[in-house]
Amino acid sequence: MARQFTLEKTRNIGIIAHIDAGKTTTTERILFHTGKIHKIGETHDGASQMDWMEQEQERGITITSAATTAFWKDHRVNIIDTPGHVDFTVEVSRSLRVLDGAVTVIDAQAGVEPQTETVWRQATEYKAPRIIFVNKMDKIGANFEYAVETLNQRLGVHANPIQWPIGAENDFTGIIDLVTLTAFEYDGSPEEKGKPIPIPSSLQDVAELKRNELIESLSNLDEELMLLYLEEKPISAEVLKKAIRKATLQASFFPVLCGSSFKNKGVVKMLDAIVDYLPAPCDVAPIVGIDEKNKEITRLNSDEEPFTALAFKVMTDPYVGKLTFFRIYAGKVNSGSYVFNTTKGTKERFGRLLQMHANSREEVKEAYAGDILAVVGLKGTTTGDTLAAEGQTIVLESMNFPEPVIEIAVEPKTKADQDKMGIALSKLAEEDPTFRVFSNHETGQTIIAGMGELHLDIIMERLKREFKIQANTTAPQVAYRETITQETETEGKFIRQSGGRGQYGHVWMRFEPNPGKGFEFVNKIVGGVVPREYVPAVQKGIQEALAGGILAGYPIVDIKATLFDGSYHDVDSSEMAFKIAASMSLKETKTKGNPVILEPIMNVEVVTPNDYVGNVIGDLTSRRGRLENQETRANAIAIKALVPLSEMFGYATVLRSNTQGRATFIMQFAKYEKTPKSITEEIIKQRS
């Protein structure tokens, strides 16, 4: 089957925003207007097409990124609708990794919110061009100019309206297109695409002023436009559109549109903007990877190049089994083809190729550069792996994911569910790189760890619904870590003689702090005092010992271990003896390395009416919070603070009580910090 849409006529975009800004409703309207669905489902009714998981429909939030494909004006638009809740930020990150551009949705009344800043930062990391849709213009308190101001102030970007609203709140009736200087009126019916009307006389001067501001702003980024502007020549819609596209693709300019997705106002114009201003795969830089010799390899966005793709998501489908979502950067692939997983060095066979629409699917036989699809049948491929044509060695840059910060113990209610639970949790961990499963060696309990209480709530619900496993959980625990703060040299010597062959392993290690770099092992042995074949055993012995901690049994992080001396016995030395000797040397750091316990510190932002600011600040301070910033937003005050996670359990209830239910808060991981001495002593006491 030949390619249906050229690369120039393809768009790969994400819908990103703070929770409740209207991302999923916006996506639903896009699907309706492009003919992908024929009945609009509402998020608040639990009938959204894109929020297909039961938990999403019940809670009215997006939990997992959902992919779909729509068609508009001879273009194929691949869309990924992403979550807005901070616990599911990883879904945004891995989606943006494979997308070429994004629509950022913001609330016209709230403007830029905390999670808007997070997803914007993620999109900036991936250099994704964006257009901005100021949604909910019909909402009480909607203020387009305020929303645009927050974009420039809080995000520090060059955002400029290319549309202007006609009215606001209940009086929001239409938009003015500043590029063409035409106006459109909406009656709110689902089929309404906007009726052309003359620009209202009360807004004629405003429209001309805002168009001039748009031209002036763009002229600093576009030479052709600058010459026309300086010579005071008329600037046509075509010239202006071309300048907007060019600056948007460079991510130096962000066009701002407006509307109300729920009331079907402005969505069609946003679809036009996606096609007009966001990049095609051939507009972005060729993908760069490395080969087995660490040399750079470039792949052009072309069907003629060798097949190169990135797996960005794994999920289990109840009907077809394990699905691997991937983006093709170069070349083409057929169902049934053999490909090479260059990250893991394994061969894989593509089963069925599927074009996804949320959780429904359409089978295709062939896929091309620029396509985003799912495939059935990959056995060992996980998120971040590179897939390439056989014989190719290119490895693309993978993805980095944050460490979990909260954990709970899980116990099945029946013995029969014990094995089933292990398999189910492994499947869920395969899907979600920020979810971890491990065993507590002291208690034998199964521990699950994630990004927040909601994250783990969803995992437990999925365990119950999808895998039919009933389980009990403990109260959430903080995922503490340990590290050393002082360089030290320690000896580990393991000798055992019990008739016949004995055991002998002996190492001298240098341990030093390695802030932010994780575990690093260096072999500095000279002269063979520790034979080469035992060095991997030394490294493994230390790595295994790191998991058990030295102060309170929490994993040790950010440590550099250098093997510099030791000895061996011709007969009695073994890998096991050197593993044990290495772990003994690590335990010595308890007295010599000045070890400390690290706790997760959270960025907390509380938005509260002015009347309750004192209550909120007092409470945050009592939780060992450090106030960072305070700013006025619309009719409220936003308070930013750094607070230890251990102090934040149950905060939602207390905040509700302190502010009569009128404040909201958002919390996300910031960093790990050393615990105060009194807290350290308390933690060690509890663990012992």
Curated annotation (Swiss-Prot):
GO terms for molecular function: GTP binding; GTPase activity; translation elongation factor activity. GO terms for cellular component: cytoplasm. The keyword Metal-binding does not apply. GO terms for biological process: ribosome disassembly. Residues 8-282 form the tr-type G domain. GTP binds at residues 17-24, 81-85, 135-138. It comes from the Bacteria. PROSITE patterns: G_TR_1, G_TR_2. It is found in: Cytoplasm. CDD domains: EF-G, EFG_III, EFG_mtEFG1_IV, EFG_mtEFG_C, EFG_mtEFG_II. Keywords: Cytoplasm, Elongation factor, GTP-binding, Nucleotide-binding, Protein biosynthesis. Pfam families: EF-G_D2, EFG_C, EFG_III, EFG_IV, GTP_EFTU. Catalyzes the GTP-dependent ribosomal translocation step during translation elongation. During this step, the ribosome changes from the pre-translocational (PRE) to the post-translocational (POST) state as the newly formed A-site-bound peptidyl-tRNA and P-site-bound deacylated tRNA move to the P and E sites, respectively. Catalyzes the coordinated movement of the two tRNA molecules, the mRNA and conformational changes in the ribosome. Belongs to the TRAFAC class translation factor GTPase superfamily. Classic translation factor GTPase family. EF-G/EF-2 subfamily. This is Elongation factor G. It comes from Phytoplasma australiense.
